[in-house]
Amino acid sequence: MNQLNHPYHLVNISPWPLATGMGAFAMTSGLVKWFHSFDSMLFFTGINNNHICFDQWWRDVSREATFQGMHSTKVGFGLRWGMILFIISEVFFFVSFFWGFFHSSLSPNIEVGALWPPSEVESFLSALLNTSILLASGVTVTWAHHALMENNFDQCLQGLLFTVLLGLYFSFLQGLEYMEASFTIADSIYGSTFFLATGFHGLHVLIGTIFLMICILRHAKCYFSQHHFGFEAAAWYWHFVDVVWLFLYLSIYWWGE
């Protein structure tokens, strides 16, 4: 079948979709355990499993594209549309969280004292810093992309490194914010909507950071050419994460407070 005269890429059997699904199941199950005051070992085991699977899966895709020549013009067109539709699906995923937040905040019920935010909920001063960090990371990833198009190896590498460091710093500050919060996910609808929306965004930041780390490894090995959709997809995803955070900041942290 792989020798047929057609422009499509018939992929070989791969263990990574199944292994990634098992890791995702371990993550979600471990998160439920963690929320109910059990240990967090299963959750972090799932994270480590998925990190390894992402690394190996991207390695295979890079080999197919760079060394085996499997990504024809038709395949590249399909990959671009696949990434666009994936980001659109993620937009609607976050729309559900914003819907839940505004549904609860515009007409708070008696369970939260008919107040929004509920009493005893303190504002977060780190949110504005996180916003500036993500906006700066959007600038650095754009800088890296333009440097790549201009065949400037060093500036592209610097831009990618700065973007990854800013993403890791954002995740670190988000973790500190969660630890210092005066409420939990179990504290009323406010806690549920806050931690679900910001937590899933934080997960997307981690995924985008891993995506950019893979781009650093590929760039260091000189895999990128004038055809570098892997880098473009990472940049699209990172800008999507930036825009979602702007809406989260304006809705939950600024207007919601």
Swiss-Prot record:
Tell me a GO cellular component: mitochondrial inner membrane
Q: Which terms in the Gene Ontology molecular function aspect does this entry carry?
A: cytochrome-c oxidase activity
The enzyme class is: translocase
The way this protein sits in the membrane is described as: Multi-pass membrane protein
According to the record, the segments passing through the membrane are 15-35, 82-102, 124-144, 156-176, 194-214, 235-255
Q: Which terms are listed as keywords in the entry?
A: Membrane, Mitochondrion, Mitochondrion inner membrane, Translocase, Transmembrane, Transmembrane helix
Checking InterPro entries in the record gives: Cyt_c/ubiquinol_Oxase_su3 (IPR024791), Cyt_c_oxase_su3_dom (IPR033945), Cyt_c_oxidase-like_su3 (IPR000298), Cyt_c_oxidase_su3-like_sf (IPR035973), Cyt_c_oxidase_su3_a-hlx (IPR013833)
Compartments, record wording: Mitochondrion inner membrane
Which reaction does this enzyme catalyse, per its entry? 4 Fe(II)-[cytochrome c] + O2 + 8 H(+)(in) = 4 Fe(III)-[cytochrome c] + 2 H2O + 4 H(+)(out)
Q: What is its EC number?
A: 7.1.1.9
GO BP terms: mitochondrial electron transport, cytochrome c to oxygen
Q: How does it assemble?
A: Component of the cytochrome c oxidase (complex IV, CIV), a multisubunit enzyme composed of a catalytic core of 3 subunits and several supernumerary subunits. The complex exists as a monomer or a dimer and forms supercomplexes (SCs) in the inner mitochondrial membrane with ubiquinol-cytochrome c oxidoreductase (cytochrome b-c1 complex, complex III, CIII).
Q: What is this protein called?
A: Cytochrome c oxidase subunit 3
Organism of origin: Artemia franciscana (Brine shrimp)
Task: Recite the lineage of the species.
Answer: Eukaryota, Metazoa, Ecdysozoa, Arthropoda, Crustacea
